[in-house]
């Protein structure tokens, strides 16, 4: 996605794992800048990565929905909004991490806690508890 200049941050379960929460997750949740150009860059990046299901949608369809699911070899949930967090805040506070030599953008721990608390599902609240426990251990 970086090669296509997609403005995104990893959120959700994978972000929790990257911040030290021991849990399983089977999809990649990303929060994207909700502009038409950015949504098109996301589609282009997914197609270049071999996710053929990206061809089944348009930038306008992504923007018309809060969540667009791309399910191919992996499941990617592209979100244009998420409870408790704006894209601009997530982007301003993002953290760059590295996986196999590729940098990617991850939501900050504080923003992740805020978003998960706002989502309010039991799994999210458990992630908040574990994230805050890790803060206490490292702080």
Positions of predicted regions on the chain:
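Compositionally biased terminal segments of proteins
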Residues: 1-139
């Amino acid at each position: 996605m970086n090669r296509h200049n997609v403005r995104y941050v990893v959120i959700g379960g994978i972000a929790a794992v990257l911040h030290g929460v021991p849990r399983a997750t089977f999809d990649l949740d990303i929060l994207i800048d909700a502009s038409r150009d950015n949504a098109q860059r996301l589609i282009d990046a997914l197609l270049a990565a071999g996710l053929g299901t990206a061809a089944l949608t348009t930038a306008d369809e992504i923007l018309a929905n809060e969540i667009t699911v791309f399910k191919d070899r992996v499941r990617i949930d592209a979100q244009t909004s998420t409870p408790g967090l704006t894209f601009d805040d997530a982007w301003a506070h993002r953290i760059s991490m590295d996986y196999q030599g590729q940098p990617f953008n991850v939501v900050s721990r504080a923003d992740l806690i805020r978003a998960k608390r706002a989502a309010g599902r039991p799994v999210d609240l458990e992630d908040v508890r574990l994230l805050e426990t890790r803060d206490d251990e490292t702080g």
